[in-house]
């Protein structure tokens, strides 16, 4: 079941699952429902007033947590920086006391600067690392004086720390004040805007009525009521101005209270920090005045000097041993280099000899080939030369026979031609008869000799042809034998070359084996030398161990004294830590008390606001219960769209839902739209304004 604002005729309706009926304040159920709504509305208003206070308190707690985290991170950075500083001081240590300054690297200088920026938190922290700071002040790049006084520097850093805390608290105070002032200004502005909206709604409702309707509808007794309503509007203006003044006065009071409380908190925090610093200074003075502490410091300084002298002696011994080892290694290297140079020279000589051998063999092969081709002592070759000479003689004889035969044939032809000429010219050449007779006789003799000559020539020709054929066959055989001999000689020379190559390879392999044997021998020599060197190093190590034992016996006494001093120092540091813990616990208790006080003050302010609000609203609530209209006004819910406005001035009659004027402004732009709660359609002309 829920209560909804409706039009003036259907002023208050109750929507249930079964029916929709009007609110009747005479019944007990309706009255209880109305009172529940009023209580819910008041609680929502209280929550709205206290939300920003809670947000501010949460913001304050977050800032305090941030400050705690900042302090913890600073302490961690201090520890890291002091570890780095201890490393730097260990590397900065020099045995010469005459050195006053020492050039640092860029990284080391940046570390020292970071440490110098972070050294601003607690006196005990500085006291624990006082010797390292003294060394840095003596040997470092940020030298303060010839006789450094670190306490003054520590005091300066402590003052810087307190000023930093004050600055942080003042920043937090300003942030809180700004948030409070913005909250009260927003509340005042919202009240003024709501009152202006109410006035505008009243003016619009008055302008809607025309003068004629007022004359017809209102009786003679109603002008008095209208005058009374006008006086009520004036009274409302006076009440609003009073409320505004009350809000401003309350804001000023709250601001003054917050400022005073924050000032008290800052004063107490600074006082606690100063007390803490004073306690640590007193403890430092007391510890420094104790004679036992001074004696321990003197013993520590003497022990440090002894350790420095021992370290110097050891460093000189190490330098001598290293110098001796370096000289020995240099000599061994020089001997090995000389041996390697000799081996390289021998290798070059072997290469030159091999190249000369190859040249000599090539020249020998060429000379052998030439001699075999020019001067041969073989009988078969002589026979071939005789055959060739016989063939050449036979050819000459055959050619001579052919030439003789041709001459004979020429003579015969000439004789035949001469007979024919003589028969024709008998009469002309009678004088040459004697010559013809001679020729005829000769011709007859020749003709008688011709058949025998032909037979002899044929026989000689056949013999010559046979001899020629035999010579050709022998010549072919001789050529084949010559080719075979040449091939055999080539094979012989190839085999000789292969034999020479194999011999050279065999020699090279022997040389390689000899080199390997030499190399293995050198390696063995090197192994023997290394074993000797190792034995010498072992002897040196034994000597060094003996020296170390001698110095160790002397340093045992120093170490025992150091242990006693360290035990005493740990006891003193434990006492200091106990004091620091007690101071920290007292500081934590103070902080807890401050937080409790702050929570109580906040609760007091919230209760005072609630009490003032109850005082202001009690008479209004009582007046609201007097009339039904006032009860309806008090029982109105907040706008369901924005959940902020306390006044629903616009009503949709179709569904009976009401909303504030700000939420209904965008619906005036369209002629038709739907309800934002139940989505029932309506037009702009249907929207009604609700009046008190």
Swiss-Prot record:
Pathway it works in: Protein modification; protein ubiquitination
Gene3D superfamilies: Zinc/RING finger domain, C3HC4 (zinc finger)
GO molecular function per UniProt: histone H2B C-terminal K residue ubiquitin ligase activity; ubiquitin protein ligase activity; zinc ion binding
UniProt entry tagged with the keyword Coiled coil: yes
Known role: E3 ubiquitin-protein ligase which belongs to the histone H2B ubiquitin ligase complex (HULC) which mediates monoubiquitination of histone H2B to form H2BK123ub1. H2BK123ub1 gives a specific tag for epigenetic transcriptional activation and is also a prerequisite for H3K4me and H3K79me formation.
Family stated for the protein in its record: Belongs to the BRE1 family.
Protein name, entry field: E3 ubiquitin-protein ligase brl1
Organism: Schizosaccharomyces pombe (strain 972 / ATCC 24843)
Gene label: brl1
């Amino acid at each position: 079941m829920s209560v909804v604002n409706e039009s003036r005729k259907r002023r208050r309706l109750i929507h249930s699952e079964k029916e929709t009926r009007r609110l009747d304040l005479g019944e007990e159920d309706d009255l209880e429902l109305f009172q529940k709504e009023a209580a819910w509305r008041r609680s929502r208003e209280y929550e709205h007033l206290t939300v920003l206070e809670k947000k501010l308190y949460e913001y304050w707690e977050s800032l305090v947590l941030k400050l705690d985290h900042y302090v913890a991170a600073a302490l961690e950075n201090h520890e890291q920086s002091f570890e780095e500083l201890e490393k730097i001081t260990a590397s900065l240590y020099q045995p010469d006391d005459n050195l006053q300054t020492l050039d640092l690297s860029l990284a080391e200088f940046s570390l020292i600067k970071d440490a110098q920026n972070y050294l601003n938190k607690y006196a005990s922290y500085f006291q624990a690392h006082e010797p390292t700071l003294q060394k840095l002040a003596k040997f470092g790049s940020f030298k303060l004086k010839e006789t450094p006084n670190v306490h003054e520097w520590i005091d300066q850093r402590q003052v810087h720390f307190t000023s930093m805390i004050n600055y942080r608290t003042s920043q937090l105070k300003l942030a809180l004040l700004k948030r409070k002032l913005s909250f009260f200004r927003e509340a005042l502005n919202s009240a003024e805007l709501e009152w202006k909206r109410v006035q505008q709604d009243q003016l619009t409702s008055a302008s809607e009525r025309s003068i004629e309707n007022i004359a017809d509808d209102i009786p003679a007794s109603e002008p008095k009521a209208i005058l009374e309503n006008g006086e009520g509007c004036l009274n409302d203006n006076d009440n609003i101005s009073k409320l505004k003044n009350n809000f401003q006065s309350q804001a000023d009071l709250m601001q003054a209270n917050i400022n005073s409380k924050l000032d008290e908190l800052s004063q107490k925090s600074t006082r606690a920090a100063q007390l803490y610093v004073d306690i640590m200074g007193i403890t430092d003075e007391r510890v420094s005045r104790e004679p036992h502490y001074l004696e321990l410091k003197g013993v520590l300084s003497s022990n440090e000097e002894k350790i420095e002298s021992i370290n110097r002696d050891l460093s000189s011994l190490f330098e001598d041993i290293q110098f001796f080892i370096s000289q020995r290694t240099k000599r061994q290297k020089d001997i090995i280099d000389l041996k390697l140079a000799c081996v390289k020279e021998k290798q070059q000589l072997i290469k030159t000899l091999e190249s000369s051998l190859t040249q000599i063999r090539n020249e020998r092969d060429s000379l052998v080939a030439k001699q075999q081709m020019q001067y041969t002592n073989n009988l078969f070759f002589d026979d071939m030369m005789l055959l060739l000479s016989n063939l050449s003689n036979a050819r000459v004889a055959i050619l001579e026979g052919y030439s003789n035969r041709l001459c004979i044939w020429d003579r015969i032809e000439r004789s035949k031609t001469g007979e024919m000429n003589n028969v024709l010219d008998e009469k002309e050449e009678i004088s040459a008869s004697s010559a013809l007779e001679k020729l005829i006789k000769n011709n007859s003799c020749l003709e008688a000799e011709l058949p025998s000559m032909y037979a002899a020539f044929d026989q000689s020709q056949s013999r010559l042809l046979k001899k020629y054929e035999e010579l050709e066959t022998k010549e072919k055989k001789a050529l084949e034998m010559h080719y075979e001999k040449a091939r055999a000689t080539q094979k012989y020379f190839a085999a000789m070359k292969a034999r020479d190559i194999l011999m050279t390879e065999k020699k090279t392999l022997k040389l390689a084996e000899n080199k390997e044997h030499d190399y293995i021998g050198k390696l063995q020599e090197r192994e023997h030398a290394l074993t000797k060197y190792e034995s010498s190093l072992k002897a040196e190590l034994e000597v060094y161990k003996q020296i170390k034992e001698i110095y160790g016996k002397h340093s045992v006494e120093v170490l025992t004294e150091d242990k006693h001093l360290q035990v005493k120092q740990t006891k003193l540091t434990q006492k200091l830590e106990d004091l620091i813990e007690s101071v920290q616990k007292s500081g934590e208790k103070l902080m807890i008390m401050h937080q409790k006080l702050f929570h109580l003050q906040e609760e007091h302010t919230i209760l005072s606001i609630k009490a003032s609000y109850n005082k202001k609203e009690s008479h209004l609530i009582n007046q609201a219960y007097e009339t039904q209209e006032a009860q309806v006004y008090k029982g109105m819910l907040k706008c369901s769209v924005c959940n902020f406005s306390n006044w629903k001035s616009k009503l949709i009659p179709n569904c009976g839902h009401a909303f504030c004027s700000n939420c209904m402004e965008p619906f005036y732009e369209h002629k038709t739209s739907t309800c934002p709660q139940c989505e029932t359609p309506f037009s702009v002309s249907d929207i009604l304004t609700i009046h008190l």
